[in-house]
Each structure stands twice: as C-alpha cells, then as structure tokens.
From Swiss-Prot:
SMART domains: CRAL_TRIO_N, SEC14. This is CRAL-TRIO domain-containing protein T23G5.2. Residues 319-495 form the CRAL-TRIO domain. Residues 700-719 are annotated as: Disordered. The lineage of its organism: Eukaryota, Metazoa, Ecdysozoa, Nematoda, Chromadorea.
Amino acid sequence: MVQTYRSPVRIYKHPFEIVMAAYEMRFPTCPQIPIFVGSEVTYEYKSVDGAEWVIDRKCQLNVEAPYLVKKIAGVDYVYFSQKNSLDRRKRTLDIEATNISFSSRINVKENCTYYVHAENENWTCFEQSASLDVKNFFGLESAVEKLAVRQYGANLAKGKEILEFFIEELLKKTTHIERFRDADQEETTSATDSAIEMKELSDGDAVLVNDRPPMLAAETDEMRTARATASFDDADSKLEAEYIRRFLGQLSPLEESRLCEIKYSLQAHHKGKLPNDAHLLRFLRARDFDVAKAKDMVHASIIWRKQHNVDKILEEWTRPTVIKQYFPGCWHNSDKAGRPMYILRFGQLDTKGMLRSCGVENLVKLTLSICEDGLQRAAEATRKLGTPISSWSLVVDLDGLSMRHLWRPGVQCLLKIIEIVEANYPETMGQVLVVRAPRVFPVLWTLISPFIDEKTRKKFMVSGGSGGDLKEELRKHIEEKFIPDFLGGSCLTTNCGLGGHVPKSMYLPVEEQEGASSSEDPLHSTYTSTATWRGYPVEVVIPIETAGCVLTWDFDVLKNDCEFSLYFSTEKIEQPAVRDGAQSPTTILNPVEMVSAAIGGASHQHPDLQCAPELKIGTPQLRLEEKAVVFQEGDSMQGSHYCSRAGTYIMQWRVPETAAGHSSTFDFGSHKCRLIYYYEILNSENFRGSVASLESCRSSSFSSIAPPTPPTPGTPRNP
C-alpha cells in the first residue's frame, strides 16, 4: 500500500532571499540532522544572468533501523538523489528527491517548494509532499514501511526548527539580501517605498530599522478567525501550520498530512461549499485518520445537509410552543476546559408527550439546531479563549427517570437521532456527565449504547449520588459558579423548559392507518390498531420463559371507554386467531349472533379469559396481576410489570360493564372501543451485565461505563 504525506503551508516570516541563504547553509553536511551524513554535488547549472540555479546532489543517510533489517539489507547507509531548482526571478525553489538505494524494491519520492507568501512579499511559504511504496523487501515489507513512516514523521518536526536555527545564525551577520533584478530593470523603488528600511552598521553589516507590517498581514489574521468560526471554508483556501496550531490544536505531522489530503482532495473533486477545517478534522478523528473512510463520510454528510437544508436550520426553523415550554434542555456557560456546556434534564422529559405533540421531525430538527449551535459556540470559544475548542460538554440529569422513558417509539426516535448525530457530527462530544442515575438507567443504556460510537461511549461518566457529594464531584469538571441550582449549585437555569407532563390537549391527532404503516414514523410503525366489543375482549398472550423479565406496554383509547387488566397463568395458552388484523365480532359473528350477544350481554356471564375460558380467577392456574382499571376516550397509558415468575401473561382490554349498562341495548356503537397498543419484553439477560457494571456508579463519584478495551493478541498487559 502506498503511503502518502502532504504538509500544511509552513510560513517563515522572513524574505525569500534570507530563507534561501539559510537553506544552503545545511550543505554539504549538517550536524543538526544526525541521520544526514553528507552530500556531494553531481551536477550544477547556473544561468548567465544568475537568475536560475539547478544543482543535483547525492546524499548519504544513516537510517536508524533494527540490526536485523540492516543485516538482511547488507548496508549501513542509504543514498538518495536531490535536485534543487532555484528561480531567483520568480522567487521559487523546487526540490525533488528520490531514493537510489533499493530503488527496485522501494520507491520514495519527495517534492518540496519554497515560494513567496501571496499576501506578504516579505514572508516565505513552504509546502512538502511525499510518497512511499514498498514493493518487495526480503519479506519485511510491513516492518520497513512502518519504520520509514515513523522516521519520516520524526524528521518532519525537526525540519522547520533546523531551518529557523540557520536563519537566526544568518541574521547575526546580515539582515538583508538584495532581490534579483534583471540588468535592464530600472531602479524604481525608493527607500520610502520599501516595506523594509535598512541601516548599515560601522562593520558593514545591515540591520532592520523599520519592518513595516503590510496591511494584508492584519487581514490575514481576520481571515483566519473567520475561517475558524464559519461553518464552511473558502473552497480555495490552503492550510497553514500556524493556523492549525492556533485554531485546530497540536497535530502530529502525519495528522496534519491527512487533514491536508482530505481538504485538497475535496476541493479538487467537489463543487460548492465544504465543511470547515475543524469539522473535517472531526471526521478524520472519527475514522482514525483514514482519509478514504473519512472522505466517504464527508460526502454522505454533504448530501444529507443539502437534502434537509441543514445550513439554514438556525435561521428558518422555529421551535414549536410545546418544545419551548416543556423541553428541559439548554446551553449553560462552559466547563473547566472552556467547552460550551449543554444541560438536559432527561428525567423530567415527557418522551411520549413530546413525541405525540410535535412529532419526530421537529425533535430531529431540535437536535440538529442544538448541534449547529454547538459548532458555532465551539468556534466562538476558540476565538475568545485563544485555544482550540472543537467539542462541547453534555450534562444529563436522570432524576425522575422511570420505565415510562423506555417507551419504544421514544427509544426508536432517540436511536434515530443518535444515528444522525454520529454520521454528521462526529467527535463533537467532549464529555458526557450523567448525574443522579437511578437503577432503571442500565436498561436504557443497554438499549442505546450499541448505537453509540465506541469513542463516544468512552466519554460517558456516570454518577448515582446527589447532594453535597455530587456537587464536589461536579466541581472537578465545572466551575463552582456554573454548577446548576438543581444540582446543588447557585447558578440559575432560567432559559430551560419546565419539563414535566405535556398536556394531552397539545397532542397531535392520531391518524389510524389500516394495513401498511410508515416505517419512518415510530408511532405508526410500532402500534397495533384494534377494537374490542362488549363481551369480546382483546387479549394479547405473552409467554415469558425466564423470570426477571420486564413487560412494558402502552396504549391509547381512541373511541369510547375500555377496561385494562393483566393476568398470569401457569398454563401454556395459545394466542387466539385474529382475522383481518382486528379482534372484533364483526369478523367472527353473523348479524343474528351480534344481536343475541347485545341482548343477552347484560345477564350473560363472560369467562375471565376469552382465550382460555376454562381458567377461573382464584385457582392456582390463573391470577390477576394488575387489577382492572377503566380508561376513558382520549386516555393514554404507559405501564410496566416485573415478571417474577415464568409462565403466560395476558393483557386484556374489554368494554366495561358500567358503560354497557347505561346505553341502549341496540346502541352497538357504545359497545365498541377502538384503541392502539404495543408491548415489549425487556429480557433480564440483555441488561444483567449492565446492572452489574453500573453498580459502581451508584456512588457520587463519576465512573466510566465504557467496557475495557481488550488487549490486542500478543500485546503484554501493563504491570
């Protein structure tokens, strides 16, 4: 596999002529570069006017390689050729280097360029690219490739330091070298026109009297700041090393190279706006700096942003009233690392009410607006603090978390949101502090953790404590003056929604869909629509094979009243057949039977279970687990039951006798109740391990909940 490298633009704040003179001081030998043994000139050409100078050198290197590699290769030194082409008129130097040793087995190519900064003619820019292709090296291709990459990366960091050293040495003797001018060129530049004014010393040396900074130098700083804070980059901009250090952070030479590769590749093949450098770096980190994988991720994200008009979401999308009033989340100052901090009181969130009142689309847009806002806040923090801030912190308060938060449509909506964020906002989460985690949290974590990237999971820290102990732990991550009041601090969070139950009057109307349902909408894809008639209940038989499972359910009464009960039987019971997806007498009885059922319904004794009429309450084979509760039209109910025994559980909905008794005998509409329902079994085996691993999180101190990374086979453990 060909290994490539491309450097960002490195800037020397010295004129091109000074940099070139310092560069030549490295030859024929350079003690500052230990592996550089020496060089000899093999070819040299100078133009008559002195504007062009081409020189070829054969250089000798003492490569630091394992003894075995040197022994097999049979050499102590390696040789490469270097061709320097200097054009004083254009003020450029092009360097081409290739290996001589083992050229049939290894191909090494390096190209470097020195040129004048486009916005400041007294600065010099440097760019570098290289490629390595190990074809065949005595069966040690992988080892040689890793060795070469490591050595090359180590020498890159020294390159600028060494040239800066020679520049400083040169400036001790002279501070000005005349530019090349053609013989017939008139001298039109006066001392007052020059950006650098010189003064000659008594010993003949010259010094800088006034280094007048060009106007564009200040503009460059503004442009860099704008580029760091904007969502998208200038398509023609180049990466500069100082800009990377200032706005993106300290990167290794190879990481800088990968950033340059993906940026310039996207610029060459993609028309239109691109994610800014900070966001490109996030994609690279999410894919371990694999340029090909990161590029695929960026392409998919660009398409997704266009399809959903994400670039304008902060300007065009308005939060619905229910979100403004009842969504308990907001931005809240910053953590100790300077990262913007978002607080979400998830335990106070009515997941069902929020989803039923504003829909999946608005909740997704809410998340996207938070992420887009977070990117802007991180960029603003970078500008304000003078240090790179590329992510934000999330504090999740789980006080109030219960089984109702495990409502399947809500969990499915959450998983969809996680999927979108992982794909389009990678590496934006600096840390996640989960506080006041109750015992039900392991169940929720088991459901969502497989969909969270492993790197992100490692950033989750959980605490189950409260009060003063929790406050002390929070002080390790958050300045005391910023700790929220509901977590024991003094900082008010007045811009957060209240949370709590969303009034049913704000619910959107439920559209019943007979037959096929939308797979995109968890409300429609999850629920089953059915009807129960007087004397003909709806019964759902649920076999539980292992004790310790949790049965959860949710239903909405759409028309008339119904009565809900939960039974348990030690007997094996089959689910009754249902025709056309609805368990109603219209598909079972003929009209005469329906009239007879209505007439005799008041006096006829119905069995406790329609699916097993031989079983009676009070016998060892059948018992009532949840007493009958009457729900009226428009009611919504979420519930859960801990299955302490294995056996058969039966959920039953029936028309209550009280409702039927007050209606006309032939008023068939009052004997029918329509509802939608769903249920889910949470198997104890799926979260038993999570419960055990999270027991340590019951204390007030924060603990990581990410599983330990298994050691690579053959890798010794740390003692």
